[in-house]
């Protein structure tokens, strides 16, 4: 006969290794600590592990937490520490880091560099030419505020990413788009905060792949490996490529949960990893500063999302990577905390709400000091 007490013992045994010793590869340089030593409630984290496996949450893949630079919690509901996670657009943020590095190295003159000036072959084949296209900058693409008629959140948009995927030349497809309108039924729209009109455009971020290759002389996947991934001890990645074999910088890059956590921690450290300044602190600050308004609660930096998360009576400003399915890598400077939540709950109506609930009701609620 199955006894409830035995079920409880099994559950406790299953959950206890979450903050114990974990297998590490020679490239995984995380230092581990107990949650309690880092000011987190182990009781609350155990409750989170139970809840994440309940019917209240769908297809959660992993949950990891770093506090004060140490890995204090990891839980794998799908796969393990070596599983490469399909976090979709969350990895757009990697493109921000690579652009910052190219600027730091003098390969790019800065965020005001004109995109079509860097891609003269593309400019010569341009359809729907317009002075506003030739004035389009790297910053316009980093902030989802280019003049192109491209909106992934609008099925009718000519630049919707699903239309891009069915053609061979993604970059030319995007650059050939007409200029988007900002008038509705003859009514003027008030200038937005920060002076930029936000329109979520994966294709614009993909164009940065060619911009980076032109500037650095290296294909983006090779540049990322040498300049970003190896310094962080990241050795196992999986890129998506366009039909012309150009790395997709607009999302789809697969990394392990621990390696995603490293990217969040890199920015939490002001661009430093160990003794090495991987990307300048100035770039980190500018990337995570608001440049465009998405809605009344959310701003956008350079391919980073910005909003405050509330736990109880407290509100914590955060910047985060975000992707379809509810995938998130969240940094909360006030708490010196970074969290990774991966999920395969793709295209579900409440995909982001459920990962936000894990963050607010459990991770932030676990903070005791």
PLM region descriptions:
Residues 234-237, 284-338:
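Active-site Gly/Thr loop motif
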Residues 46, 69, 86-112, 141, ...:
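Active-site SXXK
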Residues 117, 128-234, 257-266, 271:
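Active-site-adjacent helix/loop patches that line small-molecule binding or acyl-intermediate pockets
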Residues 321-369:
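Structured C-terminal helix/loop/strand segments within mature extracytoplasmic catalytic/sensor domains
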Residues 74, 101-121, 216-240, 274-281:
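Short, well-structured active-site flanking segments
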Residues 50-80, 336-340:
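A short, well-structured edge-of-sheet supersecondary motif
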């Amino acid at each position: 006969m199955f006894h409830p007490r035995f079920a409880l013992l099994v559950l406790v045994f299953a959950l206890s290794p979450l903050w114990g010793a974990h297998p590490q590869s020679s490239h995984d340089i995380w230092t581990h600590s107990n949650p309690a030593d880092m000011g987190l409630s182990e009781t609350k984290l155990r409750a989170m592990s139970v809840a994440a496996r309940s019917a209240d949450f769908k297809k959660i893949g992993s949950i990891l937490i770093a506090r004060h630079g140490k890995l204090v919690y990891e839980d794998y509901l799908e796969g393990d520490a070596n599983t490469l996670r399909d976090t979709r657009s969350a990895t757009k943020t990697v493109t921000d880091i690579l652009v910052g590095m190219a600027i730091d190295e003098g390969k790019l003159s800065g965020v005001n560099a004109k995109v079509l000036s860097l891609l003269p072959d593309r400019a010569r084949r341009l359809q729907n030419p317009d002075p506003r296209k030739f004035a389009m900058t790297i910053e316009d693409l980093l902030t989802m505020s280019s003049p192109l008629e491209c909106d992934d959140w609008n099925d009718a948009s000519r630049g919707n990413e699903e239309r891009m995927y069915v053609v061979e030349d993604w970059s030319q497809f995007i650059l050939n788009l007409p200029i988007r309108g900002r008038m509705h039924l003859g009514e003027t729209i008030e200038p937005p905060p920060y002076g930029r009109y936000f329109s979520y455009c994966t294709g614009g971020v993909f164009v940065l792949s060619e911009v980076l290759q032109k500037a650095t002389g290296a294909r983006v996947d090779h540049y990322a490996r040498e300049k970003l991934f190896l310094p962080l001890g990241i050795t196992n990645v999986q890129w998506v490529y366009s039909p012309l074999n150009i790395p997709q910088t607009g999302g789809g890059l697969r990394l392990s949960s621990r390696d995603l956590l490293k990217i969040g921690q890199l920015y939490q450290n002001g661009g430093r990893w160990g003794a090495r300044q991987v990307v300048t602190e100035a770039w980190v600050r500018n990337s995570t500063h608001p440049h465009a308004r998405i809605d009344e609660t959310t701003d956008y930096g350079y391919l980073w999302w910005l909003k405050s998360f509330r736990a109880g009576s407290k509100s914590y400003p955060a910047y985060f990577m975000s992707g379809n399915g509810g995938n998130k890598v969240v940094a909360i400077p006030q708490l010196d905390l970074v969290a990774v939540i991966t999920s395969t709950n793709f295209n579900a109506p409440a995909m982001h709400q459920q990962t936000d609930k894990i963050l607010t009701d459990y991770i932030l609620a676990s903070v005791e000091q």
